[in-house]
Amino acid sequence: MKNCYYLCMLFLVTFVCTNCEPNNPHVDYKEGEVNQIILSVEDKETLDIIFQHVESTKANDLLNDAEAKCVSFIVRSKTDLQQLAPKRVNVPDLDFENYSLVWCVYESPYLTAKVTSYRMFMQKDGVAQLNVDYKCTSIAAAFGENCHYALFDIPSAAIKYINVDCVQESRNSNN
């Protein structure tokens, strides 16, 4: 009976801890550290801070080898995604229910040229479904107008070099 009690308590603590949402989402970029901030698209102030930080920071200061800086958003509509997308990318009509959006900025270690990419992908149940890639062929152009982008289905091989922290289990509005 005692063992049953302890097992039940362990299960309860584990369940509660794994279903917690951060109380105060914040931006805290530390050198060499992968960051993932969970927030709602309604949190415009935090979004502004994130984009201002990224756009005003040199790529070398933001990125560290294969590591990526990732932000996970709760996306409820095409309009939400359209507002979040850099360069105002045209996005397709999708079922956004229970999807989350992950936005990463990273530098690929597998290319000889310095290629900095912004990467956004929809994910459901922790699986990437759709990818928006913004590639720049030089550090100088990383935050300029010379970036091009494409929207495409993403095979698993294409995200193998993204840090695992970028593809954590999706959080949705039902949690």
Where are these regions (language model features)?
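C-terminal motif of bacterial Sec signal peptides marking the signal peptidase cleavage site
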Residues: 15-19
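Sec-dependent N-terminal signal peptides
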Residues: 6-14
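Exposed, flexible binding/inhibitory loops of compact, secreted disulfide-stabilized domains
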Residues: 21-175
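Positively charged n-region of N-terminal signal peptides that target proteins for export
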Residues: 1-5
